[in-house]
Amino acid sequence: MAKVPDLFEDLKNCYSENEDYSSEIDHLSLNQKSFYDASYEPLREDQMNKFMSLDTSETSKTSKLSFKENVVMVAASGKILKKRRLSLNQFITDDDLEAIANNTEEEIIKPRSAHYSFQSNVKYNFMRVIHQECILNDALNQSIIRDMSGPYLTATTLNNLEEAVKFDMVAYVSEEDSQLPVTLRISKTQLFVSAQNEDEPVLLKEMPETPKIIKDETNLLFFWEKHGSMDYFKSVAHPKLFIATKQEKLVHMASGPPSITDFQILEK
């Protein structure tokens, strides 16, 4: 087997010419093994077929993760574990956002399924507004409107869509989650849809301004998922619950039928 060149030989020679440096290091070497004297044992036979595959962004010191780069790890069993990461300084197109919403089943590593106590420590950073003054219609073609009994929403069939609530959808990003977290804000207000417990009505929570960072107020965040022509809004704070409608009931949080969790986003 060919001998691997000593990449640190020149560096050692350079340091050895500096007597002050050498003397300063000598006393440390009594208690600490020298970095340059480190030896490496050959791989055991049972380790020969275990490896980790990394893309170029992981092997270069100066590279930065772009939006679509992945870190790919191959487990001993041959199972591919893949996690997409987002770069905060990378411009993200509408096509990229749609791809995330459409691709929710891609990940095998799913930090978004972590317990809420862990999720509450995650920071979500403002990215940009991705929909302005859009209307949400459920699978029965009912539109979301304000309920006059309080800070609630309800769904009803409208002949004039101008009466429907208009929402701004704001995208956020974090290092831990691969899905797309969004907030739903009533247009031209600071009223945000806030998730509650199962079967409880969602609330309209007034904020002083659009949050630049969300850490504790995760009730305001929903993972936007898209399957075919339908859109779903899964609570970040309650990952098993979705924004839902039901006949003669306020807009609420539900895990599925008999409540309706399917929506369509209608642009103005």
UniProtKB/Swiss-Prot annotation:
Question: Which intervals of the chain form a coiled coil?
Answer: none
Under InterPro entries, the record lists:
IL-1_alpha (IPR003295), IL-1_CS (IPR020877), IL-1_fam (IPR000975), IL-1_propep (IPR003502), IL1/FGF (IPR008996)
Q: Does the keyword Acetylation apply?
A: yes
Q: Name one Pfam family in it.
A: IL1_propep
The propeptide sits at 1-112
- Specify the glycosylation sites in chain numbering: 102, 141
User: Which CDD domains has this protein been placed in?
Assistant: beta-trefoil_IL1A
Which portions of the sequence form the region Nuclear localization signal (NLS)? 82-86
Enumerate the SUPFAM superfamilies for this protein: Cytokine
Q: Which GO-annotated molecular functions does the record name?
A: copper ion binding; cytokine activity; interleukin-1 receptor binding
Q: PTM Phosphoserine: at which residues?
A: 87
Q: Indicate where this protein resides in the cell.
A: Nucleus; Cytoplasm; Secreted
Might you name a Gene Ontology BP term for this protein? Answer: positive regulation of immature T cell proliferation in thymus
Residues the record lists as N6-acetyllysine modifications: 82
The record describes its post-translational modification as:
Acetylated within its nuclear localization sequence, which impacts subcellular localization. Proteolytic processed by CAPN1 in a calcium-dependent manner. Cleavage from 31 kDa precursor to 18 kDa biologically active molecules.
The organism's superkingdom is given as: Eukaryota
Instruction: List the GO terms this entry assigns under cellular component, sorted alphabetically.
Output: cytosol; extracellular space; nucleus
**Primary location class:** nucleus
- Alphabetized Gene3D superfamilies for the sequence: 2.80.10.50
What keywords are annotated for this sequence in UniProt? Acetylation, Cytokine, Cytoplasm, Glycoprotein, Inflammatory response, Mitogen, Nucleus, Phosphoprotein, Pyrogen, Secreted
Family the entry assigns: Belongs to the IL-1 family.
Physiological role = Cytokine constitutively present intracellularly in nearly all resting non-hematopoietic cells that plays an important role in inflammation and bridges the innate and adaptive immune systems. After binding to its receptor IL1R1 together with its accessory protein IL1RAP, forms the high affinity interleukin-1 receptor complex. Signaling involves the recruitment of adapter molecules such as MYD88, IRAK1 or IRAK4. In turn, mediates the activation of NF-kappa-B and the three MAPK pathways p38, p42/p44 and JNK pathways.
- Subunit description: Monomer. Interacts with TMED10; the interaction mediates the translocation from the cytoplasm into the ERGIC (endoplasmic reticulum-Golgi intermediate compartment) and thereby secretion. Interacts with IL1R1. Interacts with S100A13; this interaction is the first step in the export of IL1A, followed by direct translocation of this complex across the plasma membrane.
Q: What is known of its domains?
A: The similarity among the IL-1 precursors suggests that the amino ends of these proteins serve some as yet undefined function.
Q: What is this protein called?
A: Interleukin-1 alpha
Species annotation: Bos taurus (Bovine)
